[in-house]
Amino acid sequence: CTRWQIAVDADRVAQLRRHDWSKWVEGDPFVPDGKGGFFLKMVDGRCVFLAGDNRCRIHSELRYDDKPASCRAFPLHFAKIGEVALARLSFYCPAVCANDGRPIDEQGRWLQTTLKEAGDVGRTAPFSLDGRVAISAAEVQRIQERIVDWLKDPFRPMEDRMLACAQLLRTLSSRTAATGKRAIDEVLQGVKDRSIEEVARDGRRDGSPSGAGAVLSLFLGQDTATLSRLSRVGRFFHVRLAALGLCALYSGSMDAAARWSALRRVAFTPEGGSDALHTRAIVSKVRSGRWLMGDMSLVTGFNLVVVGYYVIHILACLRAASMGRSTCDDEDVTRAVQAADLLVFEHANLIHNPVSFRFISSMLESTDLCASMAAYVKGSSR
């Protein structure tokens, strides 16, 4: 629905044109593709049929079956890991964020139909811990189980959970480099007797704020909708200048703007439903295999999850600051989770562009990135 050219065949366009869309759409909502088909018209990067609450007007005005095939697949994505296709949901969908509707495991027919129509994205590269040590699918599963268990822990702040998981991967990387793959089981066994708080404390060490700013600026720069005249490089430097206090930081997804100094005075302490939401969003990206896609190593893939978490953190605080509040509310967190899915996890042009993804991957290879992000957000250095 956002930033994608959505292809529609001529028969579907003819069917949709029988409905009067003039109440919401100015002009023809369909753009010829020059090959006999069409694209859905985009305005400011959004499909013209996408309502302000991110719900599809074709679905609400007509029926689900009247939507183009690619739209019917939303919010489902599939990752093929080995011979298994894992389904995951996009949190850009408001129903997913609200946890509305039937559980996905009760919708087997829809899953099978959508998988057949939309297909999956398979991993072709061997699994790697850190780009150096090749590991098996079984070893990946054992590491993932520990990470998911920690991320789901309701008694520790999410930042501690993220730091503990990042520290686990850092330890695995250093130990396997020294003694080989036998260190994997030794490390996983050793952390069973340690608390998340203890491991997270180790994970905060050696984090340099300077290592985080460039990564965040790349992803947050996609969201400066009010600066659409700028190139991607220009948007990157806009975020960098905002972090230096030279201008306000803008977010199109949050419809907000505030100085970085005001943003850092906002407390990001999700509770109740908002804590459950952002935990569910983060856990789903790991458990569903999103972090294992492409050629990413486990370290790089988890760092993508780290970036997603801190984008949620920053954007929620930005919206609160723009409204003069000192703490984030549920709406701040909900909209930030939706934005992170758009900017980082599922729909980011940066991820789907091979050139920019290679550049980003090189920045996401550091085992210290989570510690750097934590230090950066706390504002000890810009």
What are these language model-derived features?
Residues 62-160:
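Internal, well-ordered alpha/beta segment that forms a basic, Gly-enriched binding/recognition surface
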Residues 48-59:
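Conserved catalytic micro-motifs used in adenylation/nucleotidyl-transfer and phosphoryl/amide-
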Residues 1-49, 64, 73-105, 109, ...:
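N-terminal cysteine/histidine-rich coordination modules
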Residues 144, 149-382:
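Hydrophobic, aromatic-lined core segments that form the binding pocket/scaffold
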Residues 7-11, 96-104, 135-140, 329-336, ...:
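General structural signal for secondary-structure boundaries
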